[in-house]
């Protein structure tokens, strides 16, 4: 596999640890008893270096930041919940989770429903293709196939690409596979390219 850096037209927003205490979030935890309120923190756990498992424990930048935030709190304790990406926002909406972090990018649509922390970084994207690919630059993806995860910035980006290239759209195959599985599929020639966050694929 090879990576094409600096993709033209990629608009990746600043990554933020999603302080998504959604408007539906329950705040009636037993404060009168003096017990700490549990903050359920959703993360996928397969997107190193942001969120991954090591020795059976969740870690990564987003996870460690959350641990540091709550370390000395006398009101809250954080409990990390591993889940699929497709369940992160539905879980926030239903108050199953009160926070989430998984290299989550900011968007105006998400800002209408969730509270974001200050940005904690920016994430460049890379276009990853097999070594013998004829895709040399971003515009070459027209008419080719890829995998995307619903609700990600990549899915939005490629949908917008197809709107502008309706005569030769990218074939979008939606999946819940993790990064390792998607790289394997790409290497086996099942798909033509994949856009990844650079730190994750590196």
State where each predicted segment sits.
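Bilobed "Venus flytrap"/periplasmic-binding protein-like clamshell domains
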Residues: 41, 45-48, 58-72, 124-180, ...
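Extracytoplasmic small-molecule ligand-binding "clamshell" domains
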Residues: 31-103, 175
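A ligand-binding cleft/hinge motif common to bilobed small-molecule-binding domains
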Residues: 87, 102-112, 157-162, 184-202
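Acidic, polar ligand-binding/catalytic clefts
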Residues: 67, 79-140
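C-terminal motif of bacterial Sec signal peptides marking the signal peptidase cleavage site
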Residues: 17-20
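Bacterial N-terminal signal peptides that target proteins for export
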Residues: 1-8
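Bacterial signal peptide processing site
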Residues: 22-24
């Amino acid at each position: 596999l090879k990576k094409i850096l600096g993709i033209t037209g990629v608009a990746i927003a600043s990554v933020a640890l999603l302080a998504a205490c959604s408007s539906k979030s329950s705040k009636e935890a037993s404060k009168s008893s003096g017990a700490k309120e549990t903050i359920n923190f959703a993360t996928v756990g397969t997107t190193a270096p942001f969120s991954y498992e090591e020795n059976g424990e969740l870690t990564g930048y987003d996870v460690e930041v959350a641990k540091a935030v709550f370390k000395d709190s006398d009101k809250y304790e954080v409990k990390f919940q591993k889940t699929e990406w497709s369940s992160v926002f539905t879980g926030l909406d239903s108050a199953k989770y009160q926070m989430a972090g998984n290299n989550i990018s900011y968007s105006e649509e998400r800002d209408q429903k969730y509270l974001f922390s200050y940005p904690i970084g920016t994430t460049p994207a890379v276009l990853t293709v097999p070594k013998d690919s004829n895709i040399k630059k971003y515009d070459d993806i027209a008419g080719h196939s890829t995998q995307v995860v619903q609700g990600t910035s990549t899915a939005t980006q490629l949908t917008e690409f197809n709107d502008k290239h309706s005569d030769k759209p990218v074939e979008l195959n939606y999946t819940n596979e993790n990064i390792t599985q998607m790289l394997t599929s790409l290497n086996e020639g099942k798909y033509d390219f994949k856009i990844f966050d650079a730190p994750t694929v590196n």
